[in-house]
Curated annotation (Swiss-Prot):
Its EC number is 4.1.1.23. One of its GO terms (biological process) is 'de novo' pyrimidine nucleobase biosynthetic process. It catalyses: orotidine 5'-phosphate + H(+) = UMP + CO2. InterPro entries: Aldolase_TIM (IPR013785), OMPdecase (IPR014732), OMPdecase_AS (IPR018089), OMPdecase_bac (IPR047596), OMPdeCOase_dom (IPR001754), RibuloseP-bd_barrel (IPR011060). Substrate binds at residues 26, 48, 75-84, 135, 196, 205, 225-226. It comes from Sodalis glossinidius (strain morsitans). This is Orotidine 5'-phosphate decarboxylase. The active site is at residue 77.
Length: 252
């Protein structure tokens, strides 16, 4: 299967290919994750598998979701020496995931190695993005680990570095999106956690926006977890979010 690759040189917005919503499968076990997948449609969202779920269920869960027609974002945030990260990214590509990420703080050589590892996969390579500043972190948190300046400024620096290394986009807070679109261009994908539909609890995310607000500032892919996975009717919740994101949808 050929997956969409977002190039920093592309003039097309990544939102033009598929749903902009990525649902975080933050469940206790694979059975619950698959039960959720059976309640929604692949056309409504992509699905994100993080460290907890992948450690517990492994590649089998990815394949089970793919068999149901879903594109999978493997959110393992690889951060290691360049050779190790290159091999990990290559393994993710072999698994057929739609998107995979690395930590931008791993540096230029690490990100470049990850990019090079995907060249043999051609059009079947996953979208490769970098994590800038975790949305759970604020300026004070960064000062605690020796990074001066604001979380926003640091995220922008890391995003520019990731683009220079040939990555397709970054994970960032919605608060940096408008600035990043200006600095990196419309074709550089912005993937944003900390998105909460109106009326939802902010949870453990400190910097949050609603889906419509995020879209308006340039976010391409919105990661949403509990407001969808814990909804009484996840498909209806997704449908409402997607409707809101349509032109004039907020007025319906």
């Amino acid at each position: 299967m050929t997956r969409t690759i977002l190039s920093s040189s592309s003039s097309l917005s990544p939102q033009q290919a598929g749903s902009p919503v990525i649902v975080a499968l933050d469940y206790a076990d694979a059975r619950q994750a698959l039960a959720f997948a059976d309640r929604v449609a692949p056309s409504q969202c992509r699905l994100k598998i993080g460290k907890e779920m992948f450690t517990q269920a492994g590649p089998a869960l990815v394949r089970d979701l793919q068999q149901r027609g879903f594109e999978v974002f493997l959110d393992l945030k690889f951060h290691d020496i360049p050779n190790t990260v290159a091999k990990a990214v290559s393994a993710a590509a072999e698994l057929g995931v739609w998107m995979v990420n690395v930590h931008a703080s791993g540096g230029e050589r690490m990100m470049a190695a990850a990019r090079e590892a995907l060249v043999p996969f051609g059009a079947d390579a996953p979208v490769l993005i970098a994590v800038t500043v975790l949305t759970s972190m604020n300026d004070e948190d960064l000062r605690g680990i020796g990074i001066a300046g604001s979380a926003s400024d640091h995220a922008v620096r890391l995003a520019i570095l990731a683009q220079a290394c040939g990555l397709d986009g970054v994970v960032c807070s919605a608060w940096e999106a408008a600035r990043l679109k200006t600095d990196c261009g419309a074709g550089f994908a912005l993937v944003t956690p900390g998105i909460r539909p109106t009326g939802s609890d902010a949870g453990d995310q400190r910097r949050v926006m609603t889906p419509l607000q995020a879209q308006q500032v340039g976010v391409d892919y919105m990661v949403i977890g509990r407001p969808i996975t814990q909804a009484a009717d996840p498909a209806a919740t997704l449908a409402a979010i997607l409707q809101e994101l349509q032109p004039g949808g907020a007025d319906v």
